[in-house]
Amino acid sequence: MSESKNIPLVQVLANALMKSSFDPKLEAWVNDLHEKISSFMQANPNLLSDLRHFLDDFKNLPARQKEVWSKAASLGWYMNFESSISMKHYVGLGQQALNSYMEKEIQADWITLTTSIIAAYPARAEILTCAFELHNEGRYIASIPLFFAQADGICDQNLDAHLFADGEKRKLAIVERSRNAEPFTDVLLELLQIKTPFNARISKYEAKDKLRAPNRNCILHGSCNHLDYGTEINSLKAFSLLAFVVLVFSKESLIQ
């Protein structure tokens, strides 16, 4: 390897510039710039390596984010219009920490979220308003089934496949939509296909299962093993699913 190939890029550029004809002021500026760049590179020897790692991380961001959101869903929570990056931190802390965080976040953003949902689907306004009022009144036994029903219907309205049924049809529709989806929208769409406590079989009624999320099948089929579902946190979890479904189809390219 020739010696010139070992010369830093900044030095090569500086040498090339210095061989050109400049007036004294421009030459002084070039010298000053060279010194500053050299000093900066000496002070940050790992800059290029760090930049390369950053670009690699950015490239893998959708896959990593999907992993976080999938984990959150397995614990009964979905992101929404107002979710912050802090959600990732609490997902890592586990069920109890995520419950406390999401409960506070959704309650703080309740008016904004409910208003956005109704604005997105005005034809459903009467039903949605009723569901939100039932939740506000503490009538969670009634609000939860309505949240599930509207999430199911909104999914069908957009994909021509229900959220809690039509598994193969929904899968094919998601694959087709993902081809022309905006960045990250394909990741959100794929989350509609994963297995969660929300869409688990009726046989999943043990205490550990019910702590994660309300089981839609148990609730709507009146399972005697899930008669204790009517809690505030379960209603908030069902609402988070509804808000997420609305978010997924909020892009103009996806709304039919």
Where are these regions (language model features)?
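Charge-enriched, short contiguous segments at helix-coil
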Residues: 199-256
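Intrinsically disordered, low-structural-confidence terminal and linker regions
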Residues: 1-28
